[in-house]
Curated annotation (Swiss-Prot):
Name of protein: Cell cycle checkpoint control protein RAD9A
Modified residues (Phosphoserine): 261, 266, 317, 330, 363, 368, 375
EC class of the enzyme, as a word: hydrolase
Entry-annotated residues carrying Phosphotyrosine: 17
Protein species of origin: Macaca fascicularis (Crab-eating macaque)
CDD domains referenced in this protein's UniProt entry, alphabetically: PCNA
Chain residue ranges for the region called Disordered: 257-289, 308-379
Annotated spans, Possesses 3'-5' exonuclease activity: 40-80
Function statement: Component of the 9-1-1 cell-cycle checkpoint response complex that plays a major role in DNA repair. The 9-1-1 complex is recruited to DNA lesion upon damage by the RAD17-replication factor C (RFC) clamp loader complex. Acts then as a sliding clamp platform on DNA for several proteins involved in long-patch base excision repair (LP-BER).
Family the entry assigns: Belongs to the rad9 family.
Catalytic activity: Exonucleolytic cleavage in the 3'- to 5'-direction to yield nucleoside 5'-phosphates
Gene3D superfamilies per UniProt: 3.70.10.10
Keywords recorded for this protein, A-Z: DNA damage, Exonuclease, Hydrolase, Nuclease, Nucleus, Phosphoprotein
Length: 379
C-alpha cells in the first residue's frame, strides 16, 4: 500500500516531502504551479515497528526527488510477489534515506537516496467549511471516469436535475475555432452515493489527472472517497479515511464555470443542431414528393440546343499544355469545342439518376422533349 501511495503522489509533484511525526509517517507533495496538494498520513499501527525519532533527537524533515523514491516501488506487481518486508530509515548525518527491501529466499535490496532538509509542507484547508459534500465508494467514481479520454485535462463535476451527479469533460471555448470537440458525460444517481449534500446547479471544474491518481489508490484499498467543495474558484478537497491512514487531496478549481453549470444536465444541451437535420437519411417516400420536373429542366436544358453542345457549368481550371504542341489549334477544334474524355452523354446521366424513380410512361424512351419553341419566326 505504501508503494501505491507513492505512485498516486507521483501524478502531482516532482518532489516528495517525507516527515516522521508522532502520529504517523507523512508523505506530501505539491505541483509546480501550487494548484494541487496531496498528503498521506500512515498511522503507527500501519507499521510493524515505528519510531519517529531516537530519544533526544529532533524530528527530521526532508524532501527527495519523486523519481528517486518512485524507482524503489516501480513494479508494484513484482513487489507484492517477492517483497516480504520494507524498512525505511533516515540518517541525518549522511543525509541519506535508506530503504531496504527484504525479499524471498533471503535476498535484500538496499537503496540509499540523498535528501535535503526542508521546512514542513502544509496546506491550509478545512473540509468542514465547505457547504457541499459527496461521499461514494471509490469504485463507483473510478468507473465513472473510465470513459474519459486519457488526454483530457479537466473534468466538470456538478449536480443536475433530479439530484443527479454529472461528470462532463471540459473543453475551453475558442471563438476562432469551428471544430467541435467530443463531449463525454456520465450521470450517477443519488442512490449511488452514501451521502449527498449539494444543491442542484452547482458545478466545479478541476484537473482529472490528479483525481485519477487518488481514485486508483482509494479503489485498490477499497475505501470511500469524500468530496468537499464550495463555489467555482475555491479549492476542492478530496479525503479518504481509514483506521490506518488518512489521505487529503486539495485541487484548485476554475472560476469561469458558471456559464457551463447553468444548463448542467439539461436535455436541451444535448439536442442536435437544427442544421444537422437536413443531413439525416430521408424516408423512401420523400422521393415521391420531390419536384422531379425541376431536376428534368436542369438536365434537359443542357441537351435542348443540339447545335451548341455546351456541357453543364462545371468549373474546370485549364491544365498545363503539353510542350510538344504549345498554342496549336486546328480548324476542327474551333468548329467543335473540346470535350472531357470519358464524360458520358447527359442523356445517360438522366437515365441513371431518374430512371428508377420515374413512372414508366415518363421514362426517356424516344428523343428528348423540347421545352422551348424554336426562334425561327423572330427573323
Amino acid at each position: 500500500m505504501l508503494g501505491k501511495a507513492v505512485h498516486s503522489l507521483s501524478r502531482i509533484g516532482d518532489e516528495l516531502y517525507l516527515e516522521p511525526l508522532e502520529d504517523g509517517l507523512s508523505l506530501r507533495t505539491v505541483n509546480s504551479s501550487r494548484s494541487a496538494y496531496a498528503c498521506f498520513l500512515f498511522a503507527p499501527l500501519f507499521f510493524q515497528q515505528y519510531q519517529a525519532a531516537t530519544p533526544g533527537q529532533d524530528l527530521l524533515r526532508c524532501k527527495i526527488l519523486m523519481k528517486s523514491f518512485l524507482s524503489v516501488f516501480r513494479s508494484l506487481a513484482m513487489l507484492e510477489k517477492t517483497v516480504e518486508k520494507c524498512c525505511i530509515s533516515l540518517n541525518g548525518r549522511s543525509s541519506r534515506l535508506v530503504v531496504q527491501l527484504h525479499c524471498k529466499f533471503g535476498v535484500r535490496k538496499t537503496h540509499n537516496l540523498s535528501f535535503q532538509d526542508c521546512e514542513s509542507l502544509q496546506a491550509v484547508f478545512d473540509p468542514a467549511s465547505c457547504p457541499h459534500m459527496l461521499r461514494a465508494p471509490a469504485r463507483v467514481l473510478g468507473e465513472a471516469v473510465l470513459p474519459f479520454p486519457p488526454a483530457l485535462a479537466e473534468v466538470t463535476l456538478g449536480i443536475g436535475r433530479g439530484r443527479r451527479v454529472i461528470l462532463r469533460s471540459y473543453h475551453e471555448e475558442e471563438a476562432d475555432s469551428t471544430a467541435k470537440a467530443m463531449v463525454t458525460e456520465m450521470c450517477l444517481g443519488e442512490e449511488d452515493f452514501q451521502q449527498l449534500q449539494a444543491q442542484e446547479g452547482v458545478a466545479i471544474t478541476f484537473c482529472l489527472k490528479e483525481f485519477r491518481g487518488l481514485l486508483s489508490f482509494a479503489e485498490s484499498a477499497n475505501l470511500n472517497l469524500s468530496i468537499h467543495f464550495d463555489a467555482p474558484g475555491r479549492p476542492a478537497i478530496f479525503t479518504i479515511k481509514d483506521s490506518l491512514l488518512d489521505g487529503h487531496f486539495v485541487l484548485a478549481t476554475l472560476s469561469d464555470t458558471d456559464s457551463h453549470s447553468q444548463d448542467l444536465g439539461s436535455p436541451e444541451r444535448h439536442q442536435p443542431v437544427p442544421q444537422l437535420q437536413a443531413h439525416s437519411i430521408p424516408h423512401p417516400d420523400d422521393f415521391a414528393n420531390d419536384d422531379i420536373d425541376s431536376y428534368m429542366i436542369a438536365m434537359e436544358t443542357t441537351i435542348g440546343n443540339e447545335g451548341s453542345r455546351v456541357l453543364p457549368s462545371i468549373s474546370l481550371s485549364p491544365g498545363p499544355q503539353h510542350p510538344e504542341s504549345p498554342g496549336l489549334h486546328s480548324e476542327e477544334d474551333e468548329a467543335e469545342p473540346s470535350t472531357v474524355p470519358g464524360t458520358p452523354p447527359p442523356k445517360k446521366f438522366r437515365s441513371l439518376f431518374f430512371g428508377s424513380i420515374l413512372a414508366p410512361a415518363r421514362s426517356p424512351q424516344g428523343p428528348s422533349p423540347v421545352l422551348a419553341e424554336d426562334s425561327e419566326g423572330e427573323g
